[in-house]
Amino acid sequence: MPRSPYRSSNRSYRSPSPSRYDRSHPSSSSRRQDDRKASRYDDDYSRDRERDRERERDRTRDYRDRDRDYDRRRDKDRYRDDDRDRRRRDDKDDRRREERDRGSDRKRDSERRSPMSTIRVDPIVSLASPVPETEEEKKRKAKERLETWKRQRALKEGKSAAATPEPKSTAPPPVTSGLPPKPTAFSLSRIGLPLKPTNPTPLKRSMAALDDEDTSDRKLQKLDLPDFDPEVQSGDAAQVGSIGADLAVADGDEDDDTVVKKEEEKEEKMDIDKKAEEDEEEDPLDAFMRDNVQQVVEVNKADAKRMGLRVAEDGSDDENQGQVVEKDKLAEAEALLQQAAAKSRKKDLPPPDHSKIDYEPFRKAFYVPPVEVLEMDEEEAELVRLEMDGIKIRGQDAPKPVRNWGAFGLPQGCLDVIKHQGWETPTSIQAQAIPAIMSGRDVIGIAKTGSGKTVAFLLPMLRHVRDQRPVSGSEGPIAVVMSPTRELASQIYKECQPFLKVLNIRASCCVGGSSISEDIAAMKKGAEVVICTPGRMIDLLTANNGRVTNVRRTTYIVMDEADRMFDMGFEPQVMKIINNVRPSAQKVLFSATFPKTMESLARRILVKPLEITVGGRSVVAPEIDQRVEVRDGDTKFTRLLEILGEMGEEHKDEDDFRTLIFVDRQESADDLFRELLQRGYVCASLHGGKEQVDRDEAIKNFKNGDVPIIVATSVAARGLDVKELKLVINYDAPNHMEDYVHRAGRTGRAGNKGTCITFITPEQERFSVDIVRALEASKAFIPDDLKKMSDSFLGKIKSGKARAAGSGYSGKGLERIERRREEKDRAEKTTYGDTSEALSLSSREGAVIPYKAKTNEFKPPETSHKGEADYTFTEIKVDIVNGPAPDRVSSQPVFNPKNAVASLPAQTLAALEKAKKEGRGVDAANLANVVAKLTQSIELTKAEKLGLAAATSAPRLAPGARTKDPDATDWHAIFPINDYPQKARWKATNKEQMTLLQEVSGASITMRGRFYPPGEEPALGGEPKLSLLIESNDEMRVRAAVEEIRRVLVEGSVQALNAVDRAGASGGRYAV
């Protein structure tokens, strides 16, 4: 709103005019009378009206937004003050006070005119302080009044006929008690209220001036009245006065007691009200927490009674409460172990009873041989296989190879895609594997890298899926393709995309490293084909207690790069998946290398498989130019830069020229990547330690040509298909022949030319044997220095100076998994108190795991599992001994009758057996005595030989001669920890934990002995097994320390078991 031009300069903008509403102000009338100022008045009026509206609006908002409680109290005080001020300013109150004063004056005048005024008590006497009367004086006065009343009554009866009654006094009788008199007509105003007293005391005047209520505290007291002669009064006046006085006295006595009782009741009510107010003012949060504490106490008592613990009563000592707390801690530890055991079994897929499941029937034989194939005899078929890179088949009733795509019986959509891709004829592995798979046979396909193995199992899979009804909801996939690496799974998924579109088949790629929620969503929508890694497939099958997906409809399983998959430790996951699939499902295994040791595992999974081998088991393609250079490690990087420069000059006309550099470690890949970046080369690194997103982005950029160089570990040696890849450099030599074949196979794919250069140092001579073998198999040139290195190492092996390198992908992951299983079982048995079947790791080194041959007989699996209640630690018992701890813990078992006979020498045992055969009896007691003496003498002889005869014989000769150590404690316990897992031992014996244990328990804890591996026992006279010695003069402290150590070992054992479960799927230096 614009400002008025007539605003006064001495006022603020929002303040009203001081004389705006003051009608008595002279300027007001003059302003109205002055016509020249009329417009200004109107402007000021409108301005002030708008200003008042704004002020009222602000006042309303403040009232609405005010603090309720505070403002109410403030307004209450304000209203009371305003009411008091208003009563003081009101003229009506003054008139009422004047009327009361006039009524009091009339009352005094009437009292003066009354005849009773002659016996009025002097006000000075009435105002005197009362003198307390004794009981005798009260009785005497009452008796005198009674006699006076009798005389007056007798006089009245004698003169009742003749005497005329005197007029009664209209004045009220004199008040003889401390209570105020009852109101009469003289003491009432015109409206029936008592008049104001004429002579109020100064105290009453001051209280009336300060307070708005005329309330005063009244004291009940009796006045000491003077005696009077009843003869002075005539007529009934004396009677009335005396009787009224007597009644007043009686009423006063009664009122004193009544008032005291009422005051006591009032105080009790006030106390009750205060308590009620205190209860009402209690904080709701405090009340809620108090109720929770009571409920917790009740629940703890109920749990303690249910568990058989003694519940401590109120006022019990802290010792009983400490025992209950220790029991609770132990229960929590056992619950923690049960939870860990449940988690370890969470991803377990128990095999179902296939005989009780009604599976849908399916068809897996689709191949119908064409006429030209039917007319071909076996000799012609062998010639065709020989022309196609020497195809070798093992198995019965193998189909004949096919040379054109139309003879496979594929859908028309697949043929259109094949024509669009420009594939003229099938490759060797495709010509033989596709007819075999489409005939419904289990197949093992072994072919060189880049030979089209992926299409060899994809086309039969699509025909197989197309024959069945679509998947609806969460029925599960029809076909499952498993690969060892995420990159290979993604590549298979991309390669089958063109076929999926034309056939209207849904597929999902489920690999680790990404969120599982997307995979779960895809499974719920339904997918006929799932391309996955084994670990992620297990996660999907166990997600939400198996309600996400299942493999009941799965009838086609592919394991690509099967040997690498088992070598990386995927055997448990793969076997779980296969055991859950129906036994009649079709299974296919493909790989470029398939060692003979893997055949037993393959035949365990497959049923009468056909083994198809193209070009040898581990052979580099002839299109690849292989070069091997022997040089020192310091010169490798310089030579690498020279090769990159030379190749760049040779292929400068080619825009798409890619290079793949292999190293053996993730750190080496990152270091070499940084070195190449500093030299100006655009490159990327690829290894298992990188996130999945980074790995996918690196492969995508490499295939697109944005990054021409990639430094990778062997994680990229499988399935990476880049047609423009012309150069592969093995910066670090591969450690076995199969790895060399797969690394070199990344180039020269689909008939293209490629180059593979390998660096090997003199320190890596053990790898030279496999490289020479691979070069010989592929008929490549072998350098002289490499041949000399290989022959030298073979000579060392023959002489026993060196050990041969590993044979590559031979299933070493299976042995590693088996060892881990033994470690886990041993840890569980040790933790649960059973060490009878503990085995030494050294006894399992180099052991060959036997595989049972696959049979057609199906046996329902055992589904009985131990419950979680078995995971308890009740077997952990430690004896608390009353006495000082021994100086040395014996490493040999204590002699007892159970092991008495077993501990005898071989000659003694032979003599006993001979005596039994001859029928001679042997007394058990005599035998025990003899055995004890023999054992003692044998030990003494051994000790003398070791030079310990004096130390061992002295205690035996004089057992009581040993003096007690003044620092020895009264109680001790020995807690053995040698057989617990390493994580549990470390957790119980680290410095911080030992300090904490001593502070909590108050006992002394020291570590004795040394660690012995499982299966190894201490030698005679050697240090005992690792244990903890607990000492204290208080038994409760020793017991508390034992319980605390027990809890720590339980938690450490749980963590060790979980670590073994997590590490089961990953092993070796190859990470997924």
Swiss-Prot record:
Binding site for ATP: 447-454
Start-end of Pro residues biased regions: 170-183
GO molecular function, one term: RNA helicase activity
Family annotation (Pfam families): DEAD (PF00270), Helicase_C (PF00271), KH_12 (PF23469)
Reactions mediated catalytically: ATP + H2O = ADP + phosphate + H(+)
Gene3D superfamilies: P-loop containing nucleotide triphosphate hydrolases (3.40.50.300)
Protein name: Pre-mRNA-processing ATP-dependent RNA helicase PRP5
Record flagged with keyword Hydrolase: yes
GO biological process: mRNA processing; RNA splicing
Source organism of this protein record: Cryptococcus neoformans var. neoformans serotype D (strain B-3501A)
UniProt biased composition (Low complexity): 1-19, 193-204
Domain Helicase ATP-binding: 434-612
Entry comment, domain topic: The Q motif is unique to and characteristic of the DEAD box family of RNA helicases and controls ATP binding and hydrolysis.
Keywords linked to the UniProt accession: ATP-binding, Helicase, Hydrolase, mRNA processing, mRNA splicing, Nucleotide-binding, Nucleus
